[in-house]
Amino acid sequence: MEDRADHRQKLGRRGEDLACSYLEGMGHVILERNWRCRHLEIDIISMDPDGIHFVEVKARQKNVQAPPQENVNKAKQKRITSAALSYLNSSPLHRNMECFFDVAAITFEGEQACVEWIPQAFIPMYI
């Protein structure tokens, strides 16, 4: 029997797969998935003609009351921003590009999924 942690991990992976497909359909090139630096992580880093996108993916089952994007609170935004700065410092090629902080909120109902794309979900104070 699958435990809760395994279920959440599989749901998250499915959500990230859908988000990548969605982004590629919009013309993005996926640069990184689950990029890590120390204790920080960015779910997806993609690029389009406008710039570089740091994407937080939130996936939930339909029966959960709050929408997935509500989990991207100020503390989470700060961690994503710190991770983005680390990425930009380690990637001189992307350092001078316009940066966007987006959220892919994915709601699953059985095998069906609804992707809500939230471009520029937040604007950090320092980037």
Where in the sequence are the language-model features?
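Acidic-basic catalytic patches of nuclease active cores, encompassing PD-(D/E)XK
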Residues: 1-33
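Conserved catalytic cores of phosphodiester-cleaving nucleases, focusing on short active-site segments
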Residues: 23, 42-65, 80
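Hydrophobic residues on conserved beta-strands that form the core of alpha/beta folds
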Residues: 30-32, 54, 101
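Anionic group-transfer/hydrolysis microenvironments
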Residues: 34, 43-45, 58-60, 104-107, ...
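Short acidic/glycine-enriched loop/turn segments that link adjacent beta-strands
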Residues: 37-40, 111
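Structural motif
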Residues: 39, 52-54, 98, 115
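Mg2+/Mn2+-dependent nuclease catalytic core
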Residues: 61-84, 90
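Domain-level recognition of nuclease-like catalytic cores that cleave nucleotide substrates
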Residues: 90-127
